[in-house]
């Protein structure tokens, strides 16, 4: 027995006793009856040069580099790799040929369905298609493509397609360069002519604009001269208007001052009269206040005394009412306390009664369970025992006797004796029953007659003692 530990890029594949299939672990105990294999899961680069042929039957070589390794993030894929590939070294010819066969097969099938132009121009899409198809095949071995790099396509010896394609591109580039040079020369000569024409045009344009500007300057000078003369005239008129306005304002101020002086004289006279009236009014008000204070002093003292008296009486009455209310409140509180105490006592009594009923019910339940067990759970026997023990039958008999005491009922008892005869013989049983029926009929009719007074039909016969009773009833009726 040994304890095995795998490195960071390794796993332990353990088989043997106690393991159903394969146990994958990084570290584990390995017993003598178990086998342990260490396999590496680090990816490996595989370089290939795949010879393929396009749909136009043009052969070429596809250099490719694939980085392939076990899928460590999928336990099922890792188990597949351990079962199928772990016994071979990842650099062995077996693994190399397996991967190369899958890549070459899928690449050739894909290239055979594409043209050379599609392969050459769609390198990115071509790489994705190869990646997906190869990965689909590698899934069954638990392998995954970490990276796939398709290099530049190469010609097969004897088939220089890419060489001719490069020469074609070079010739097209050279021809395009010549065309570009010719166009540049043409643009240069045309540009020189255009510059010369533009120079002449611009010179003529500048001369014309100079003449226009000189004429404009002369007109502007004349306009400025007229404008200055007009402004001088306007200034003179404004000054004359200002002088006239100042004269008018002076006359207005003189008239206003004269008016103000006359108004001031009138206001002074009126102010003296108003002051006299105000002083006279104050004198009269002071006289009225003096008389008012005198009257107030006379009547207010009397009213104050009456007010104090009324206030004292009201306070005394309020005090008496408060005391009465407090007494009534105290009495109500005592009554409420007494009522509460009585209610508590009644509640306690009811509570004790209820507890007694519960205890009695428990005792009766135990009693009934004991009785029921004694009669082997026979409810009818227990019911009969309880009715006999409690005197129910005696009470029923007394009640019935009291009920029919004053009714004076008629009770008929009869027996035809057919039971004993019915027990004898087998062949005569039917005849005995019929005979018993006939024997029973007369007593029944007699009983009906005694109880109800009704006679049987005439075809049956006449009852004994019926005629005397009828005659007796008739005599009573006549009497």
UniProtKB/Swiss-Prot annotation:
Cited InterPro entries: Band_7 (IPR001107), Band_7/SPFH_dom_sf (IPR036013), Flotillin_fam (IPR027705)
The protein's name: Flotillin-like protein 3
This protein's GO CC annotations: caveola; plant-type vacuole; plasma membrane raft; plastid
Topological category with respect to the lipid bilayer: Lipid-anchor
Lipid-modified sites (S-palmitoyl cysteine): 36
Keywords: Cell membrane, Coiled coil, Lipoprotein, Membrane, Palmitate
Gene for this chain: FLOT3
Compartments it resides in: Cell membrane; Membrane, Caveola
Pfam family, one: Band_7
